[in-house]
């Protein structure tokens, strides 16, 4: 391995090990805590989910959080047989997406369901529950919203996430998803026109700490960049990065 490459690798590793939470949570539109997954749903899957929502019986969204007075939406109950098919479509699509593994390090996923917001509905500032009463209990590390309505179909309804002193509004194309830490305070702004349909779920990660997940993602991105060089890729660099990734996973994983 050339001296320059070894020095570069050493600097890269030292930079990773020096990173702290403050550097990883700087608030801006490209914040590494927030992951935009494009084209999670295929067009036929999106159409099927919208058709299911059209014919399904929605109930008061407080069924899943009765103690939150600011939750004003509707959802298909997660224990309703009608939730099985859309839940499976959303789950399979998310696990199929190549960026989910790196971004979430998913260990388990709650049963997805569909939520609906009509004009006047919203979900005030809140933080998602830490544990879900499943068997066994599941911890929420990563919150997931899959957008089923195009932004032009409704006004308002932005998912608003607090990042330090900033608030990041998110309103994505139908079929796209956003992942964000379940530890963030967030809200859904009031819908003023149209209908906002979304799929929602939560992920328990093998790596509970968001900063550690981001470091592993940076290492994976570095490996991808090096592998993209093809025959010019430095095998020793790839070996070191792969070793670093695997050993940090062993160190941090709660498996």
Residues covered by each model-derived region:
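Mature extracytoplasmic/luminal segments of secretory-pathway proteins
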Residues: 15-16
């Amino acid at each position: 391995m050339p001296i320059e490459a070894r020095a570069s690798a050493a600097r890269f590793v030292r930079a990773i090990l020096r990173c702290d939470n403050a550097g990883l949570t700087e608030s801006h539109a490209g914040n590494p805590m927030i992951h935009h997954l494009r084209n999670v749903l295929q067009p036929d899957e999106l159409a099927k989910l919208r058709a299911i929502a059209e014919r399904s019986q929605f109930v008061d969204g407080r069924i899943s959080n009765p103690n939150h007075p600011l939750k004003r939406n509707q959802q298909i109950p997660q224990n309703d047989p009608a939730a099985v098919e859309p839940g499976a479509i959303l789950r399979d699509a998310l696990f199929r997406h190549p960026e989910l593994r790196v971004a979430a390090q998913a260990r388990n996923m709650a049963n997805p369901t569909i939520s609906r917001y009509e004009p006047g509905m919203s979900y005030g500032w809140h933080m998602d529950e830490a544990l879900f009463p499943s068997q066994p209990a599941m911890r929420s590390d990563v919150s997931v919203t899959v957008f089923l309505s195009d932004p032009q179909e409704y006004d308002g309804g932005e998912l608003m996430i607090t990042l330090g002193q900033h608030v990041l509004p998110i309103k994505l194309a139908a079929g796209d998803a956003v992942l964000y830490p379940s530890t963030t305070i967030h809200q859904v702004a009031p819908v003023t026109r149209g209908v906002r349909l979304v799929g929602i779920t939560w992920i328990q990660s093998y790596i509970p700490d968001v900063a550690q997940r981001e470091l592993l993602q940076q290492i994976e991105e570095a490996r991808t960049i090096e592998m993209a060089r093809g025959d010019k890729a430095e095998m020793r660099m790839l070996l070191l990065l792969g070793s670093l990734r695997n050993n940090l996973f062993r160190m941090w994983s709660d498996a």
